[in-house]
C-alpha cells in the first residue's frame, strides 16, 4: 500500500475508527519491538511504516477535532 493510498483511506475514517486503528497499530508496533528483542524480526522496515501511519492518523484526529470545535 502506497503512502498516498493509505492517507486517502485514513481520511475516509471517522474519529472512532481512527482511534481504533491507532490502537491496533500501536499493538503491532509493540509486537515488532518484542520480536526484535528476541531476534525473530526480519522485516525491520515495518517500524518506519507503522510509526508513519500512527503519526498520520494522529494528525487527522487532531485536525478533525479542531474542525469540530471551530464549527461549534
Curated annotation (Swiss-Prot):
A Pfam family of the record is: Ribosomal_L29
| Gene transcribed to yield this protein | rpmC
Protein's GO biological process: translation
InterPro entries the UniProt entry points to: Ribosomal_protein_uL29 (IPR050063), Ribosomal_uL29 (IPR001854), Ribosomal_uL29_sf (IPR036049)
Q: What is this protein called?
A: Large ribosomal subunit protein uL29
Q: Which GO terms describe its cellular component?
A: cytosolic large ribosomal subunit
SUPFAM superfamilies (UniProt xref): Ribosomal protein L29 (L29p) (SSF46561)
Give the family per the record. Belongs to the universal ribosomal protein uL29 family.
What GO MF terms are annotated? structural constituent of ribosome
Membrane-crossing residues? none
Amino acid at each position: 500500500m502506497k503512502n498516498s493510498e493509505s492517507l486517502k483511506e485514513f481520511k475516509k475514517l471517522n474519529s472512532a475508527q481512527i482511534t481504533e486503528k491507532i490502537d491496533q497499530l500501536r499493538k503491532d508496533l509493540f509486537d515488532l519491538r518484542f520480536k526484535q528483542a528476541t531476534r525473530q524480526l526480519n522485516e525491520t522496515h515495518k517500524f518506519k511504516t507503522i510509526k508513519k501511519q500512527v503519526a498520520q492518523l494522529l494528525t487527522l484526529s487532531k485536525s478533525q477535532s479542531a474542525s469540530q470545535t471551530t464549527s461549534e
